Curated annotation (Swiss-Prot):
Protein name: Nucleoside diphosphate kinase
Domain of life according to the entry: Bacteria
Protein purpose: Major role in the synthesis of nucleoside triphosphates other than ATP. The ATP gamma phosphate is transferred to the NDP beta phosphate via a ping-pong mechanism, using a phosphorylated active-site intermediate.
Organism (species): Rickettsia typhi (strain ATCC VR-144 / Wilmington)
Subunit structure: Homotetramer.
C-alpha cells in the first residue's frame, strides 16, 4: 500500500447544516488523517478555474453557482491509498445510488448538493491541493 495525499472539499450544504464534524468523523474513522483544513468562500473566478474541466458541460454554471452559495471546507487528507479510500467513503456521486454508511448516502441531498468533493486521481489530487494550499499549510 502507498501513502498518498488527496484533496477533499466539504460543500455548502454540509456547512449550512452544521455537519462538518460529522464528515470529518467519517474520514478519520476510515483511516484518513486531515493534514490541512481551512474554511472559505470561493469566488466565482476560483470556482470556474477549479471546475474548468467541466466548463463545456451543461451543469457547469449551476455547479459554480452552488459551490459559491456558501462557505466550503478545503482539506488535504493523508493515508494509505488515500485517493481510493476517500472515494469509497464519499460514495457514489448521486446520493440515491450511494451505499449505506457513506457520506453522500447519509448526508447528501442531491447530485449537486452531495456533501463532498474528492480527487479522482493522483494528478487531480496534486492539482487540487496545489490550487488551494501552499506546502507550508500542510502539517505532517
Amino acid at each position: 500500500m502507498t501513502i498518498q495525499y488527496t484533496f477533499s472539499m466539504i460543500k455548502p450544504d454540509v456547512i449550512k447544516r452544521n455537519k462538518i464534524g460529522q464528515v470529518n468523523t467519517y474520514l478519520e474513522n476510515a483511516g484518513l488523517k486531515i493534514v490541512a483544513q481551512k474554511m472559505k468562500f470561493l469566488t466565482k473566478y476560483e470556482a470556474e478555474c477549479f471546475y474548468d474541466e467541466h466548463r463545456a458541460r451543461p451543469f457547469f454554471n449551476s455547479l459554480v453557482e452552488y459551490i459559491t452559495s456558501g462557505a466550503v471546507v478545503l482539506q488535504v487528507l493523508k493515508g494509505e491509498d488515500a485517493i481510493t479510500l476517500n472515494r469509497i467513503i464519499m460514495g457514489a456521486t448521486n446520493p440515491a445510488e450511494a451505499k449505506e454508511g457513506t457520506i453522500r448516502k447519509d448526508l447528501g441531498e442531491s447530485i449537486e448538493a452531495n456533501s463532498i468533493h474528492g480527487s479522482d486521481s493522483e494528478n487531480s489530487a496534486k492539482r487540487e491541493i496545489k490550487f488551494f494550499f501552499s506546502k507550508s499549510e500542510i502539517i505532517e
